[in-house]
Regions:
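Walker A/P-loop
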Residues: 1-18
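Structural motif
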Residues: 2-4, 35-37, 109-113
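Conserved H-loop
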Residues: 8, 39, 143-145
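Walker A/P-loop NTP-binding motif
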Residues: 14-29
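Conserved strand-to-helix beginnings and helix N-cap segments that scaffold or border functional pockets
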Residues: 16, 48, 121-125
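Conserved nucleotide-state-sensing and coupling region of NTP-binding domains
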Residues: 29-96, 235
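Conserved RecA-like ASCE ATPase "motif II neighborhood" in helicase/translocase motors
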Residues: 78-130
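Non-catalytic, compositionally simple segments
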Residues: 121-239
Length: 239
């Protein structure tokens, strides 16, 4: 299930809430392990902290966050760290590094975050899709990183019926309509106004400039730097 999303719209935060509910359920109720894969350690920490927050909100019985040993590549350094939250259900949420071999022999839900920016997404997907055979799920979340990126190829293949799956799309304006700016106001402790929201949206688009098409409007750029319209994307997907 790929999700094409704009920058900073809360997709990972929302995914964490769903993942906590999944891991907190019993096996009979559909519970299973969740494996989160970001492309650096900071993403793993942010995600696990979001899961811990949601676990408290849902009053899910969990242990403390447990550090473990795994290799993350970050700025040329090899950092040994994973993070695990264990639930009373017996299931756990684990943040792993981006090595495809990490998923071998595992079962549950796989979340690949900012998939278009992983160095070996094709191999990572191969390893993740094996979990579907025994009833697992694979959630692939990302902003775009060009039209030739494996993430965009995956989306086009699903739209064309060459691969199974569902594609979800959340662009920046949709997120604003659903309350993104209201949440920003809450975090910044300022009052929401319609005029303020309009100006804020305009300012965000202005500082992204030409990159707003890809970063905010979920339209992948061509290799030449031009942008693909939504209608052209859909037309190409069924050629």
């Amino acid at each position: 299930m790929p999700r094409r999303s704009s920058r900073r719209t809360g997709i990972t935060w929302a995914e964490a809430s769903d993942n906590v509910l999944t891991a907190a359920r019993s096996r009979a109720a559909g519970g299973m392990n969740v494996y989160y894969i970001g492309y650096n350690m900071d993403m793993a920490i942010e995600y696990i902290e979001a899961c811990a927050l949601w676990a408290r909100v849902f009053n899910a019985a969990v242990s403390e966050i447990e550090p473990g040993e795994e290799l993350f590549e970050q700025d040329g350094d090899r950092v040994i760290k994973t993070y695990t939250i264990r639930f009373e259900s017996g299931f756990r949420i684990v943040a792993l590094s981006s090595r495809p071999a990490n998923l071998r022999g595992k079962q549950g839900v796989v979340v690949i975050d900012e998939a278009a920016f992983h160095s070996d997404l094709d191999e990572l997907l191969k390893a993740a899709l094996a979990l579907l055979i025994w009833g697992g799920r694979v959630h692939v979340i990302s902003t775009h990183n060009g039209d030739q990126n494996p993430f965009n190829v995956l989306i086009n293949d699903i739209r064309a019926g060459r691969r199974a799956g569902k594609v979800h799309r959340v662009d920046f304006r949709e997120a604003v309509a659903d309350g993104l700016y209201r949440r920003v106001c809450l975090r910044r402790r300022i009052d929401w106004t319609a005029e303020g929201e309009t100006q804020w949206v305009a300012d965000v688009y202005k500082f992204y400039g030409e990159a707003a098409n890809e970063e905010l409007d979920v339209s992948p750029s061509q290799g030449s730097g031009a942008w693909l319209s939504q209608s052209l994307i859909e037309a190409r997907s069924i050629d």
